[in-house]
Amino acid sequence: MRENYGSTMIQALRTVLPIQEKIKAKEKKYICLDISEEAGAQLLKELEQTRFKARTRLLRELLEKKRLDYTHAAKELGTTSAVVKKFQEQGIIRIEYDEIMRTSLNTGDISGERRMPLTDEQEAAVKQIQREWKKPSPKPVLIEGVTGSGKTQVYIKLIEQTLSQGKEAIVLIPEIALTYQTVRRFYARFGDKVSVINSRQSQGERYDQFKRAKRGEIQVMVGPRSALFTPFADLGLIVIDEEHEPTYKSENTPRYHARETAIERARMEHARVVMGSATPSLEAYSHACDGEYLLVKLNARYEERPLPQVSIVDLSGKN
């Protein structure tokens, strides 16, 4: 990236590693009983004879629940840091931390997607791509499909195949098209295997999603241009939807193009690249015509649904 796009090494690294080191994990603090119930019960009897009411309340609650939310203990039981420190020094309790993953995706109302069967044309497109993938050096794939032809269903089928091989997938979608409805289709099909990043998320939320990817907790990352640098260990597929969109070209140094960078990452990691558009960019279409890309066409809308009607209205002279 530094050599191809004329940037410094620092600029290239900041692009590839977009999450700053100063972002820390979000954790929840817990107080846990660290002695036996018998010893705790004996200690509670002793404390009840003293004036240490806060210690008594905390120990009584711990004997019932064994593990308490630190915030709850402070608010509801009046537990202070001095009480916690004293119990820690005496070996009565220990402090534990649970990591909390930050996310802006509300998945509560997302149910499983009704699986739509592939049309004959979509099935033929998938088989054509699969034949290309069996070659020693498969080409990037460009799907030219009219609006509503079901390119996303083809992507999902190819992602399913990739995941069945134990590999991971990245789906690039322009920020303007990264809507709840778009994300919902992937989440409804793949569930918790999917994560999303976008520019509206906080740095902490993005940090957590990249961390989940690095740990292997997810297998599909959906997002704009920056999602290309998701730290997957075994990347198998990169999908670039609406590849003609100008937002795939970075306006900041290094001024890389996501399409070219995706193809290079795929080459380095032995992954596959699939691009799709109803109106492919001149560059991509030229590469396809020259045989550098495999061109796959979807000419019919799904279930032969008609295109929306368009009317031309003359508004001149109207208020």
Model-derived features: positions:
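Accessory, non-ATPase domains that flank or precede helicase/AAA+ motor cores in DNA-metabolism machines
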Residues: 1-277, 284, 289-305
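Cys/His-rich short segments
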Residues: 316-319
